[in-house]
């Protein structure tokens, strides 16, 4: 194999392998949606979930998406029930949302576990910028939320 061809093949393989491990988060778009144990309406219904719940997309088929939730549970959901809009789920019992990405910054609001907040961006220093459904924005530590 010619060196340029081998290099091109190597770069293609490395790029493809990297994309396999990239996390792809989606959220529930409908007011509620059903999680199933298989990609079929005839499958066992596992759970009903609410709008904005973040889910990690594991596999996508034509009409179904295999997803993982914050507890690590795997299930299937109809693709039309999902949105690409990003949300995070609060996983700590009580979380202070700060005005700036600093622990000593003023707190703009507090929120509880299992609340969904719109994801705006993640910083390199471990903070996530979020928006509450009421429109208030602030920063939380990345370790206190899931789905970022």
PLM regions and their residue ranges:
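SH3-family beta-barrel domains
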Residues: 19-37, 45-51, 58-99, 106-116, ...
């Amino acid at each position: 194999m010619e060196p340029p061809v081998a290099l091109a093949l190597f770069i293609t393989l490395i790029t493809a392998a990297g994309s396999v491990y990239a996390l792809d988060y989606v959220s529930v778009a409908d007011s509620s949606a059903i999680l199933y144990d298989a990609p079929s309406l005839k499958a066992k219904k596992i759970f009903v979930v609410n709008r904005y719940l973040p889910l990690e997309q594991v596999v996508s088929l034509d009409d179904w998406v295999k997803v993982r939730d914050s507890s690590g549970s795997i299930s299937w959901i109809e693709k039309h029930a999902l949105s690409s809009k990003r949300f995070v789920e609060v996983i700590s019992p009580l979380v202070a949302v700060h005005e700036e990405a600093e622990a000593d910054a003023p707190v703009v609001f507090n929120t509880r576990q299992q609340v969904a907040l719109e994801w705006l961006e993640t910083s390199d220093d471990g903070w996530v910028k979020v928006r509450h459904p009421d429109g208030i924005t602030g920063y939380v530590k990345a370790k206190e939320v899931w789905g970022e």
